[in-house]
From Swiss-Prot:
Component of the gamma tubule complex that is required for the regulation of both interphase microtubules and mitotic bipolar spindles. GO terms for molecular function: gamma-tubulin binding. It comes from the Eukaryota. GO terms for biological process: cell division; cytoplasmic microtubule organization; meiotic cell cycle; microtubule nucleation; mitotic cell cycle; mitotic spindle assembly; spindle assembly. Keywords: Cell cycle, Cell division, Cytoplasm, Cytoskeleton, Microtubule, Mitosis, Phosphoprotein. Pfam families: GCP_C_terminal, GCP_N_terminal. This is Spindle pole body component alp6.
Amino acid sequence: MSEIHVKTALSRLADKYLQNSKNPSVPYTIETIVSFFQEIIHSISPDTFQLDIDDILYKIYSKIPPEENNDALFSKLSNLVSRLKSQTVIHNKSQILYFLYLLSPISQSSRDVSSHLLDESISNPINIPSTEVESSNFGQTRYDQVPENPQITDWDEGLENESSISIAHDSSRLNRSTETSSVQHTLITEADLLSSISYVLQGISTEYVQFKNELALLSKRIPVQYLLQMRALSETGLLYQELKVFSNYDPSVSQSIDGDNVSKAFINDQSLALQSLKSVISKELTNFLALIASLDSQIRADASLEKPMVTIRRCIAWTQVAKLKLRILSSVVNDNMNQENKKRLIQVVSKYNVHGDPLIQELSDKILTEITGPLYEMIENWIYKGELVDPYQEFFVKEKNGSESHDHQGQGDVVWKGKYFLDKELIPSFLSEELVDKIFLIGKSLNFARYGCGDFDWAQEHYQKLVKKLSYRDPHSLETVVDKAYTESINHLVYLMEEVFHLTDHLKAIKKYLLLGQGDFVDLLMESLGNSLDQPANTLFRHNLTASLESAIRSSNASYEPEYVLKRLDARLLELSHGETGWDVFTLEYKVDSPINVIITPYCSRQYLKIFNFLWRLKRIEFALAHSWRRVNLGERNVFRNLDYTKFEWHFVSCHLAEMIHFVCQLQYYILFEVIEISWQELQLAMEKPNATLDTYIEAHEKYVTSITHKGLLGGGKSRNEDSFLHQLHDILKVILNFHDAIELLYNFSCSLSNRIRINVPISTDALAAQYTPIKNELSNFTEEFQVRLQKLLHGLASHKDPEMRFLSVRLNYNEFYVSHRRRHDKDVTSQ
């Protein structure tokens, strides 16, 4: 702008002032005021005009008294400054704004253009605000948020945003003197500050900036136009020092480092990922030092030039990218200080990878590539060898401590089901849940094949065939290797279970011999053991039971079973109790060992024992009823045909015996065909699926056993609960056995009476009635008790939520016999 234009603008400003003057009687002319304005302009230091508009605006804001309601003033001021910025014909906008600031009442160094001050101002040019105090006085600048809340929260606000790691500057804390000092001080120039920038960027104390712990103390001698710039550089130095202390921290050293708040948090929380992070930080700090060295050499070379090209503002611009990187690294470090994030460093860094800023994405990718190196090595050991190498417990696959003690319900061998588990909190976000499940299953399969099945050769072949270096930068290779390893390991494990360890053959053998599916074997065993099991339990010997078992095997189709099946079948006695018979303690067991016991677990074996005991008791009842039926039919034809005295009772017995046989046969049919066979078909379908795994086998077998115990009336409740179906069935079967014993008494009485009649022995009517009446009463009582208990069972089955249970109720009472019988009984009771 030419001198004429400047003078014209000042004249208009003076005229504007005179029009708005609060004291119009003062005889000042436009020329006098313009001369005053020119004196102000000439008295301003050239360095002052290097301030930009934002710095000057910040200074104006800081001078406005806070107790006033300044919202409207701030809004108006911002609007005017925006209009000033939009003027394209004005080039020296910042100088104009600073000049107007000096004229304003809020400027402590300005003079009011009024009354008696004007002459003094003209004769004594305006003083520039003092920028010097005693050299020992420093304004205190603090990183308040670094140790307390070090998260980078405002990345989207731009690179100049200072809110995340802020230097809290308080003008009252700086305590800059605005009064004219009687002692002349040396003015700090930009060249002086530039000479110390390389030290400030490293967090090293200088004459103008001192660093103490996490504090940066700025000298009050620093000119105001450089204050914000030096604060920005001091922030970079604090970031550098924080990261340097963290990267150099050695947990093996017991002594503490002053100000090392970050590193102290990691004394007992070292990990391979954390060590990799320290390596990344060390590399970035080395690059930053190279940048500082280049910057320092440029400053030194520029010092000899007449017109230096390097300024503090340019230094800030050149180090801005490096500063942002240091911010990100500091945020990562401080985020990981959270106790919940100690082992989740990869997850902490991963959230920066979805940021929209390319620089942040690039740095986070670089960090992730380094810190995921140990993770991918653990994955390689796991999917190639089935070995868990995790010295710092940071891998998402964990090994249970004391896993054997966790097998309270016998849920499987610890090699497969109780040894390893997934810690979902440690799963990185860039690995899908499906991929992690496959990785987990591959390692378990390899470990199980090696240590559970003893197949070391295949595990070595698997490693040599698939070995490939994995990394974060090549996720496709990881998916390809995992899919291939998953298919091979699962197929091989299924092959081992089926072909080498004969899993299906063992399940079929259990179905035949423990679930009484081999009819000829069961009948022969029942006949050979019948007389022995009638004896008291304490008179039985195991070798006698074993001999009967071997005899039944040789005499039935069981003799064609493979040797590895027959040698697992054994007879034994349960724990003896006083007064029990052999029927109460005899049982068959099928012994399984590793690795079959992973599927046929100890818990499942106990369930099989429970099922066998119930089916064996039901078979005993069937055997007893068949014997009673032969007694009735053969005796009626040969012995009791002409015996009128017991004819009515034998007819009564025949009717109710058929009723009990119907109940037992229908119950057996339901359990053997509707429950066991249907569940067996479902088990086979699950095991024959092309993608079936060992876990599929385990789940299918558990479902198979659970279905039998539940639908077979064995899992409706605790056995001691009077309302459970199992307890009711035991009571009904006990009544049937008592009825069978009463039939034996009636048969013996009838035979004795028939012989006495045949040989014409005198018979006393009273003596005969004394023997016969108790038998009649027992038969009647047992029959009535059977019907009452059966009706209660039918009522429970009919109201059960399971449709198959309701179907059993229909089978047992298909013609509503017990409903009509109950109506007749209630009618007879009412009539009496």
